[in-house]
Regions:
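Acidic/negatively charged segments and metal-coordination signatures
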Residues: 1-200
Length: 200
């Protein structure tokens, strides 16, 4: 198994999950690569400068994004993820997450973006910047109460009679956004999994 495949898989998984234990990383890489990695062989295969170049680190047997190092936020994320399965897309889809800003273009996110382009007032740069911000905000620290201020901060406006529909589109997009605290699953997927489990 080539080290490049290990690095590609690992970088993509850390971007998708936010944090992942060394042991779980081995299990998932093995499932994609038909390999037999264990923590010992994984350590010897990794070039840590590759991870650091992607703002990723190994702390206490966990690979994580640098943003979760502040104030030990990774501990909160690990707790939030407890007992959840890992979302494992196709290998082709997984590797899209090598790009740190990649986000799956769901129909709900596409509808939200189209609505913003149609109804928001502001310069092209302001609207594009807000689209980028909102896409990241949906998966990181989404709070519906922050939406009005965020619009103003980016120099944009929206007609008052369109605001309620915009908020609903935000909520829909968030429900279908892959989240770190869900180990890559969307809230919608977890809800459906819970319902199916209750029926069985």
């Amino acid at each position: 198994m080539k080290n490049k495949a290990i690095h590609d898989d690992l970088v993509a998984m850390i971007n998708l999950y936010g944090v992942i234990s060394v042991e779980d990383a081995c299990t998932i890489i093995n499932s994609y690569e038909k390999a037999d990695l264990n923590p010992g062989t994984l350590y010897t295969s990794i070039q840590f400068e590759v991870l650091e170049a992607n703002q990723m680190f190994l702390v206490n047997e966990y690979f994580m994004l640098e943003i979760f190092l502040d104030e030990f936020e990774y501990l909160d994320l690990i707790e939030a993820q407890e007992d959840l399965p890992y979302y494992q897309p196709s290998k082709k889809e997984l590797l899209k997450y090598k790009e740190d800003l990649y986000q799956e273009e769901t129909p709900e996110l596409k509808a939200l973006k189209e609505y913003i382009i149609k109804w928001f007032k502001g310069s092209k740069v302001e609207i594009v910047n807000y689209l980028d911000y909102l896409s990241y905000f949906l998966k990181d620290s989404f709070n519906i109460e922050d939406i009005p201020n965020s619009i103003n901060e980016f120099g944009c406006t929206i007609p008052q009679n369109k605001f309620e529909e915009f908020i609903q589109l935000c909520l829909n997009a968030h429900m279908h956004t892959r989240l770190w605290q869900n180990r890559g699953y969307t809230n919608q997927e977890l809800s459906e999994m819970k319902q199916n489990k209750q029926r069985s």
